[in-house]
Structures are given as C-alpha cells and as structure tokens.
Amino acid sequence: MNLKDPICAIATPPGKGAIGVVRLSGEGALEIAARVWRGKDPRRLKGGRFALGEVVDPKTGEAIDQAILLVFRAPRSYTGEDLVEFQTHGSPAVLRRVMEVLVAEGARPAGRGEFTFRAYLNGKMDLAQAEAVLALIEAEGELARRQALRALEGALSRRIEALENRLLNLLAHIQALLDYPEEGVEPLEAERTIREVLAEVEALLAQAKASRLAQKGARLALIGAPNAGKSSLLNALLGYERALVSPIPGTTRDYLEAPLELFGIPLVAVDTAGVRETEDPVERMGVERALGIAEEADLVLYVVDRSQPKPAPPPLPWARTLKVATKSDLPPAWEDPEFLPVSSLTGEGLDRLKEAVREALLGREGGEVLLTERQVEALLRARERLEEALSLPEDLMGLALEEAARALALLTGKEVAEEVVARVFQNFCVGK
C-alpha cells in the first residue's frame, strides 16, 4: 500500500441524510479535486477556506450535485496532507457517484482508518490519541465521551511521557555512576523514583475497570425477595414507570431490562423475579434465572424491605453487591448500617444510592482515563518490570528499567510492532 497516493472515502454514516461528506487526501488531492469541481479552483483556495459549486463528471461535464468544497492544506490538516472535503446532499446515489469520479481521476478507496493512520504516521497524533478517535466515535455514554476527548487532547500521552522521561533520566544517572565512578556523580535515590513511577502506573491500572465500563456499559441487577420493592426501585432510578408494581408478591415472574445512564455510564438495569423458596416450578425457574443474572452482573443491588422482618440472604456475589433497604418512609422492623435506606415513594436516599453505584463501578478516581485493552497490557508489563527492578541492586536494575520504559512507550506507539498498529486501525470505519 502506497501511503502517499490520494485516497477517498465517504465519511458520513450509510443511509440518507441532509448532508453527505466525501474526503480526499494525499499527493495530488488538490489536482483531482480541481478536475471534478465546477466553481472556484481548489488549488487557489487557502487552507481552511470553502467554495460553493458543483461536483461534475469531468469526462461528460455532467453535474452530479451542488456542493460545498473545503480545502485543508498540508501540514495543517487532519492527515497532515493536502485534504479536500466535498459536502453534498446526503443521498447514497450522490455519494457513490462522487466516489466513482474521484476513483476515475486517480484516487483509490481508503482502507479502514487510513485517514487516521496517515495522521499517526505524519505525527499529527500518537497511537493513544488514534485509539481515542475510535473511542470517541463509538462513545455511547457521557463518561466515555469525556474519557475519549481527554485522551484525544493528549492527557494520557502527556502522563505516560512524563513517566517514561523519569525512567530514562534514572537510567542515564545509573549508567553515569557505573561508567564514571571516579567522577563522583551524586547517587540518585533510585528506589524512591521507581516507587513513585510504579504508584502512577498502579493509579492508571486502577482506572482500567472504569474505562472498560464507560466504553462497554455495565449490567446492574436488582435482586431480593418478592415484594421487596425491586420494581419500584427500578422505576425510581429510571424516572418513569417501566416495571409493573403490585402489592401482591411474585408479580415479576421473569426478568425485565431497561437502559439507564448514571454519571455518564450506560447501564442496563435488570429487575428480576423475587428470590425465595418455592414449590412452583415456574417461579423456581425465575429464581434460578435471577441468581444467574446476579452472577453475571457488574453490580448487584440486594433489595430488602426494611418495614418487614429481614429475610435470610440468598447466595450472591457479595464483593460486588450493594445492600439496599427499601420503604424507608415506613416504620423500620430492623436497622443495619450496611444497608442504604431508600424510599422509592419519596425519593429519600436515591441520590446516595446513585453515588454508591458510581463509586462501586468507577472507584474514587471517577474513571476519567481512557484505557484500551492494548494499553492495559502495556501498563501491566511496565508494572512487572518496575517491581523486578526494586528487587535488584542499582548496578543490575538497568535492563528491567529499560524494559519498563519500553513498555510505557508502547502506549503512545513510540516502540510498537507494525502488526499491532494494523490491529488498532482495522477497527475504524473507512471514512476515518
């Protein structure tokens, strides 16, 4: 693949729309654009300027559509190359035809993520920022959007670069001590530096779960005895009536799912059948399914009616379970500080419960860092090498520190295999 030749792609989603965008980038992009454009010559436009005209078939002179043409000149463009965008009406037929004439004039259809790949190769962004582009495109919740934008703006890259520089400075100092002991080079507190870098790596890894949940979403299971108030609590969390509520125990015989966003996290809240001992085979199936849902959930709300005697707890994954005492507006039959009191009727305790859900899913840091699986692997490798370095004397820790610095460099793509880069960009859409 020639990474200088002109490429083109439809940059807007498939289907009909008010506006469609076709991108053209690479050597000769302005010349190709001039041949398919009737209006002000794109070659005469300054970067960041636009013109109104028509996209035409240069072989027949036939107009394809009225359009706006935008010119971005190298290196001040997304790709770092000369780049042209045609903004047409969002008709699939129009967009296909524009692509046809561009290809006929010498451009080739872009591969997946090739525009962003060229931006990476031309130094417009590092690999962590390129991954942030994809995360921003795919973001479904507000937290994922914030994470991706911060990474795209370089927040993670700057943090990693600072750690990498600390290790490289330490390596240089250790090497100077070994090579020129007679010069009296001041010894550096290597252990303290390594522990500080290790603490930063640990802090990043602590946010890996939050990053995954922000990007992929989480499942929240409501588990409890019949008539414990699970359906009412679900409706209160949603802010509208989704689940059927009845004073008759056992109203919910199967599970019910509803989408919910809390603190920017896309959740699927699952209201389950009441968990109790029963001879009814249908209800028993519902109970078994409820317990299975709890095992697979990212977080469980164990819901108990505080106005009634406390039941024996069911088998639940307690490490990721919050205990909720419902009907707190009624006189209590028991008190337990491990339970969060909530009234679905008055709303008392709902904000505290939501905050507890946020902290259980995201931790105290709040999950503002975007980390991909590839980046987490690199951080784990860096942590392993830093821990190894701590167990070695100064004159032997150099190799472990070099490998730790190299692992950190993988995050931003400074030292990364070609196949890894290809794997990152194969998940992109064609027009990006």
Swiss-Prot record:
Residues 217-362 form the TrmE-type G domain. Keywords: Cytoplasm, GTP-binding, Hydrolase, Magnesium, Metal-binding, Nucleotide-binding, Potassium, tRNA processing. Its EC number is 3.6.-.-. PROSITE patterns: G_TRME (PS51709). K(+) binds at N227, S246, I248, T251. Its main location: cytoplasm. GO terms for molecular function: GTP binding; GTPase activity; metal ion binding. Binds 1 potassium ion per subunit. It is found in: Cytoplasm. InterPro entries: G_TrmE (IPR031168), GTP-bd (IPR006073), GTP-bd_TrmE_N (IPR018948), GTPase_MnmE (IPR004520), MnmE_dom2 (IPR027368), MnmE_helical (IPR025867), P-loop_NTPase (IPR027417), Small_GTP-bd (IPR005225). One of its GO terms (cellular component) is cytosol. One of its GO terms (biological process) is tRNA wobble uridine modification. The keyword Magnesium applies. GTP binds at residues 227-232, 246-252, 271-274. Mg(2+) binds at S231, T252. (6S)-5-formyl-5,6,7,8-tetrahydrofolate binds at R23, E85, K124, K432. Exhibits a very high intrinsic GTPase hydrolysis rate. Involved in the addition of a carboxymethylaminomethyl (cmnm) group at the wobble position (U34) of certain tRNAs, forming tRNA-cmnm(5)s(2)U34. Homodimer. Heterotetramer of two MnmE and two MnmG subunits. NCBIfam families: mnmE_trmE_thdF, small_GTP. Belongs to the TRAFAC class TrmE-Era-EngA-EngB-Septin-like GTPase superfamily. TrmE GTPase family. This is tRNA modification GTPase MnmE. It comes from Thermus thermophilus (strain ATCC 27634 / DSM 579 / HB8).
